[in-house]
Amino acid sequence: MASSNRRVLVNGGGPAGAVTAFWLAKGGFEVVVTERSMSRPYGQGVDVMGRAVDIIKKMGLEQRIRDSTTGEAGLTVVDDQGEDVAPPLGTAPIEGGTASVTQEIEIMRRDLTKIFVDAAEALPNVTFRYGCTVDEVQQHEKSITAVLSDTGDPEDFTAIIGADGLGSAIRKLTFDPEINRRSVSPTNTYVAFFSIPGDPKYVSSAARRLSPAPSLCPRSELCDSEGGHDANAYDTPVGKLQHANKGRGILVRPIDKKGTQRSCYLMSQSDSQELAQVARTGSQEDQKALLDNRFREFTGPLGKRAVEGMHSADDFYFTRIVQIKLDSWHSGRAALVGDAGYSPSPLTGQGTTLAIIGAYVLAGEMAKSPDDLERAFTSYYDILNKFVSESQEIPFGGQAPKLILPQSDWGIWLLRTFYKIISWTGIWRLLNFGNETVKIEPEYDFGGLD
């Protein structure tokens, strides 16, 4: 066994954990990654943008990731009959604009995780232990000890990194209970994620709508020579969003370029105590029953498709949207990365981008100061804190969920009218949908190994 002063435990095998492990290994650490789940990840689409794209290039993974993207060609709002209210908003901003409704890299979380895990596991000084949790942690002056569930034995490390998401076990085990409690900032937005089969009857109208406007569709692998989508595709490459009153919305998006599967999102904006309780403690059966009751009355084909798909989905996941906010991302020799330390929530679209950037900076600072982790962890916070704060800002002054999921029929009419205006005029391309303004400058050589 390697000396504990070069051995790091990363708890969590998602994007944050796998990227952290990759760069720590490049920096000369021996890395153990513990991942509690051995099952299929739920079907959530994630975005990679800005500085995070530069980091995946450094990892040599850009082309593989681009080859695995969903192929989403844009997003459209549909009416109560499931018909587009206006042409889709695409992906290509005009000069002077920063808008991109569908991001540069849109990929399913499970696909991105596999790519990052494969890259980390290929390194000789990274070990993944699946079906394993961290049960106990004890801090010492020059090391930190963890009891891992797969052996039940204490093991010594120089540091433990919590890359274990919103409900981070490392945060709970190493941070003051009151600090941990106050770190969770809930919203009144709820979402269920799951996948459904593609359906060929949805492709033709989308292909016709996209054909006259090839500038909306830069996804060349999906388009014919005139810019229209391949009529042989199995389902539309366009995301579709339908609304109903009481703050409800259904969003269906591509999972892959062939259209054989779709990701589905049932969204609710509500102060309902029943929603809060079922999201927190309800069984999956309770959650599906509640959502069935809320969404079954949707008119048009989208509601029926979504509700029926929810009941047969094997990757269903329902949650209340929360953010994690802390004044420090470390406690002793334990540090947090990604959602565990600073989740911006899906409302910002920044979660995966933050996780990748955070993993790179954390590993870089640890490689620079392996014998002074207090300095490394403090620098990590100082470098990223302003960027994280910006990334956690929910669009439209925090009102985005209320605007996107109106409570009244009048509000839905206004939203659809606004969508028609920005779609037909093209002014959406001049809007800013949350692109980076705070720049992250650090570069690390990881001992010349990157």
Curated annotation (Swiss-Prot):
Q: Which family does it belong to?
A: Belongs to the aromatic-ring hydroxylase family. KMO subfamily.
Q: Name one GO molecular function term.
A: monooxygenase activity
Q: Give the induction text.
A: Expression is positively regulated by the cercosporin cluster-specific transcription factor CTB8. Expression is also affected by nitrogen and carbon sources and pH, and is also controlled by another transcription activator, CRG1, previously shown to regulate cercosporin production and resistance.
Q: Which UniProt keywords apply?
A: FAD, Flavoprotein, Monooxygenase, Oxidoreductase
* Job of this protein: Monooxygenase; part of the gene cluster that mediates the biosynthesis of cercosporin, a light-activated, non-host-selective toxin. The perylenequinone chromophore of cercosporin absorbs light energy to attain an electronically-activated triplet state and produces active oxygen species such as the hydroxyl radical, superoxide, hydrogen peroxide or singlet oxygen upon reaction with oxygen molecules. These reactive oxygen species cause damage to various cellular components including lipids, proteins and nucleic acids.
Q: Give the source's domain of life in one word.
A: Eukaryota
Q: What is this protein called?
A: Monooxygenase CTB7
- State the gene name recorded for this protein: CTB7
Enzyme Commission identifier(s): 1.-.-.-
Give the matching InterPro entries: FAD-bd (IPR002938), FAD/NAD-bd_sf (IPR036188), FAD_aromatic-hydroxylase (IPR051704)
Pathway given in the UniProt record: Mycotoxin biosynthesis
- Glycosyltransferase among keywords: no
Effect of gene knockout:
Abolishes the production of cercosporin. Leads to yellow-brown mycelia with significant export of colored compounds into the agar.
Q: Is the Cytoplasm keyword given for this protein? A: no
